[in-house]
């Protein structure tokens, strides 16, 4: 074993990590240090991440029999003002809900909370959420492949896992994720030795830190190195924006990152589980082609342009059915349960207000035809497949990217699709 070196001390006047948050107040964040024991159970090893309202730490679970191997967890320590925050409570409730049926074959592909507790800090209690540690987000894993493209054979394996996870969310937990993106699909560790090696390296080469006003702030260490094998499983994670599909009222408020907005979200005709199916369909392009399906959805100033997004949908999928436009007209005056600020900060109560509609006239015609690309076809955007494999893939994806939510296949139905069953080179 090599000798441990002293940690690098960073300049006190150079902001790092959570200090860069606008309006940063150190009193909001619990001071956590390697070796600390949280909840008399979780011994802190290293800081592995941070966000606007939390820091994330790798910890050793000390509640195990002496003959068992080490067990590690990640502890998300939220800011003090998050204990009573509805978002933090919401995530806590949703993640508990996700344990409804651990025997379902999709359960292993959903990241669930292992424990939660409160830690007392200077400004009051801090809500702490405990999860299984994960190696890396899908976007980082993609970078390990040429041009960011997952090989079709591996993509099919991962899609089968993700669809099982979605089926579990939808059919068993009655949860709509609403925020499926590369950041929120995490990959596990290929072998426990990867974590053990990481912990050993932390002991030999501690995290750089800075000390300001008696408080240590650490530079995250979260690089676990290249995978030793690709037998690592993906999990759907981050349920902070997830919604229950069991309510009696229609769900209408805006969801999803702009790239992944489903048509019914943009048109305000209410959404349900099928919005996740659209979301995954769009995400598949990035996983397979290393680029976005909808490439021209921003203005010259970089702002999201709903008109351009709908125009690109029309170019790739054809015009929306008249029934959807009629539905949009009927729903246009229905107000959301609460006002939501748009990108300009204006409080909006309908999809038309929020997204700047209407976009179609009463005859169902798109009002911005000049924005529709004339040289864009769905078939031409698939470059990684050929022949029968490409034909089967297009049939598969078209069952996800349907204008009408009710026309999309469910996650369970998609698992039986011929493209997922066929072998890819």
Residue ranges and their predicted role:
Residues 1-425:
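Intrinsically disordered, low-complexity regulatory segments of kinases
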